[in-house]
Structure formats: structure tokens, C-alpha cells
Design a protein with these regions (language model features):
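Membrane-interfacial loop-to-transmembrane-helix junctions in polytopic alpha-helical membrane proteins
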Residues: 7-14, 43, 88-95, 99, ...
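Intrinsically disordered, low-complexity regions of eukaryotic proteins
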Residues: 21, 37, 279, 312, ...
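Small-residue-rich transmembrane alpha-helices that serve as helix-helix interface/gating elements
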Residues: 271-283
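Intrinsically disordered, low-complexity regulatory regions of eukaryotic regulatory proteins
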Residues: 17, 177-180, 202, 308-316
């Protein structure tokens, strides 16, 4: 049993090493390319080269996190069956593998800072649509964030291929990947050479802010995964509600509203993601209503138990007679 579990751990270590390699390649490619855009538009200033230092620290942090992930549960369970068994419980607040969502938070904030600078300094707006390193190439570079999220999720679990845990993780990864790609497409509204639109300054800021918020939001999904041990335990209801509410109010609803506004008043081409926003709103509301009712019911039950407990503490003899 120990030998079989050791082989399983060896195969998992090989897969983890491959994930680390691909993750580092993506981080280096994305970070250095965005740095190239910033440095090229600000030639003569040495300060912009310090972005490479930030990319290096982010890459090293991600590599350390991926290398820190222990062997799969099968190997740990085999050792505990032969040795002294003890339950490995996650931290009640930080959850399992807290550095995973911390690394995404640092990475996404660094990405958001670069994206904001690219658009606030008019670097992205001046790119040619058909140039080799133009608009489409910049979109592809920013969209690499979806690959980073996918590798972070895949590198922190060992779910069986046909298990409910694997189904849940695959669904979450796919949904979050589409959300990130939707944000990149939404940023495309800020390229005047491609859209042939001149947005007002408040609308331009709204598009940029909403897109950047959606780059940070997957950190909450990773935090939710850490709390439920990547699908092994029931998912916290409060976090589920918060995640769905934020997606409705900060992603699907405003994205749909702005796209419909530009389509109706300016004749802008309709993005296929407008259908995704409609489906996201419908599915989000349909899933949110029963969860919200359950959450309110649990809150009322907790309040009732607290009132009963207070009454027992005040007059336990009277309650016993009743």
C-alpha cells in the first residue's frame, strides 16, 4: 500500500513540476511583455524597469507556493493508516493552502496596476489594430491571466477524474476562465482604433474599473476553495452568496448594461459575450434565490436558539416545568 501511494505521489509531483514550469513561463511572458509596452512608451526613464523586479518577486512567490503543495491525500492517508492516525484539519479562518489565494491577490493587483497604466498613459489606445504587437497581441497577453488561474486551481488538488469534487472544480475553473476572457473583451471597448468609438471620460473609467475588478474577483473563488478544502467539504453558504452577489452586481449586470447602451445609442457591434452576460444573470438569480432563502432561514434559526438559550439562562426552572 505504501509503495503504491509513493508511486502516486511521484506522479503527482511530476504533474506539479510541469504546472510550475508552465506557470512560470506564462508569468514571465505576460509580465515582460506588459513591461515592454510601458518601457517603450516611456523611453529615457529608468524607473519603469523596476516592474521587472516586481514580476520576478511575483514569479518566485508563485513558484514557492506550487512547490510547497504536499503529496496527494492518498499518500498521506496511507501513511496515517500505518503510522499514528490524526486528522489534518485546515485553519478555521485561512483554510487549506491560504498562500494560493494570496498569490492570486498579489498577481492580480500587479496586473491591474499595469493595465491601468497602459490605458491611463494612452499606451494601449495608440496601438495599431493590425500591427504585430498591436491590439490583438495585447489582448492575448492580458488574457493569459485565465491560464494562471487554471494552473493555480489544478496544482492544489488531487481529485479523482469521475468524482463530484473534480466536477465542481472543473465547473468553477471553466466559469472563472470565461469571466476573465469576458473582462479582456470588455477592455476592447477602450481601443478607439478597433471600435471607432470615442467614449466619455466617466464611461471610460467605468469600463476600466469594472474590467480590473473582475481580475481580482477570482481571488474570492480561491478563498472559497480553501475554505471547503477544494470541494472535499461543504462550501460556506455566506461565501457562496457573496461571490454570486459580487458577480451579478460588478460583472454581468454592468457589462450587459454598458454593451446594450453602446449597441443601442452608438450602433456598436454586439459582442457574443452579451449572451453570456444574459445567461449569467439568469443563472445567478436562479441560484441566488434558494441560497438566500436558506441563509435567512439559518439566521432566523440561530436567533431563535440564542433567544431560547438566554431564556434558559434567566429562568431554567420555569422552562423545565413548561
Amino acid at each position: 500500500m505504501r509503495a503504491m501511494a509513493a508511486r502516486c505521489c511521484s506522479a503527482s509531483s511530476l504533474a506539479t513540476a510541469l504546472d510550475v514550469l508552465v506557470l512560470l513561463v506564462v508569468l514571465v511572458f505576460q509580465g515582460s511583455t506588459l513591461d515592454f509596452y510601458l518601457i517603450r512608451s516611456n523611453e529615457g526613464s529608468v524607473a519603469w524597469y523596476f516592474w521587472f523586479l516586481a514580476d520576478f518577486l511575483s514569479g518566485e512567490f508563485s513558484r514557492a507556493i506550487q512547490s510547497w503543495v504536499p503529496c496527494p491525500p492518498a499518500f498521506v492517508q496511507a501513511q496515517r493508516e500505518e503510522d499514528a492516525p490524526q486528522e489534518d484539519c485546515p485553519h478555521p479562518v485561512w483554510g487549506r493552502f491560504p498562500l494560493c489565494y494570496v498569490s492570486w491577490l498579489l498577481y492580480s493587483l500587479l496586473l491591474v496596476a499595469k493595465v491601468v497604466l497602459l490605458f491611463r498613459l494612452d499606451v494601449a489606445q495608440l496601438l495599431e489594430e493590425n500591427a504585430r504587437y498591436g491590439v490583438q497581441f495585447l489582448k492575448a497577453v492580458v488574457a493569459a491571466a485565465a491560464v494562471v488561474f487554471l494552473l493555480l486551481v489544478e496544482g492544489h488538488h488531487d481529485a479523482a477524474s469521475q468524482s463530484e469534487q473534480r466536477t465542481y472544480l472543473r465547473s468553477l475553473s471553466t466559469g472563472t476562465t470565461f469571466e476573465l476572457l469576458d473582462s479582456v473583451t470588455f477592455l476592447g471597448l477602450l481601443f478607439p482604433n478597433e471600435t471607432h468609438l470615442t467614449l466619455t471620460y466617466p464611461l471610460e473609467n467605468a469600463v476600466l474599473a469594472l474590467a480590473c475588478v473582475n481580475f481580482v474577483l477570482p481571488g474570492l473563488a480561491l478563498f472559497k476553495l480553501s475554505q471547503c478544502e477544494y470541494g472535499l467539504r461543504p462550501r460556506p453558504l455566506g461565501l457562496k452568496l457573496l461571490y454570486k452577489l459580487l458577480h451579478l452586481s460588478l460583472v454581468n449586470v454592468p457589462y450587459l448594461a454598458i454593451r446594450v447602451y453602446l449597441w443601442g445609442f452608438f450602433g456598436h457591434d454586439v459582442s457574443l459575450f452579451i449572451v453570456k452576460n444574459l445567461l449569467g444573470i439568469y443563472a445567478g438569480i436562479r441560484a441566488l434565490v434558494p441560497d438566500l432563502r436558506l441563509y435567512c432561514f439559518l439566521l432566523s434559526e440561530r436567533g431563535a436558539r440564542k433567544r431560547v438559550g438566554d431564556a434558559e439562562a434567566r429562568d431554567p426552572i420555569e422552562l423545565k416545568v413548561m
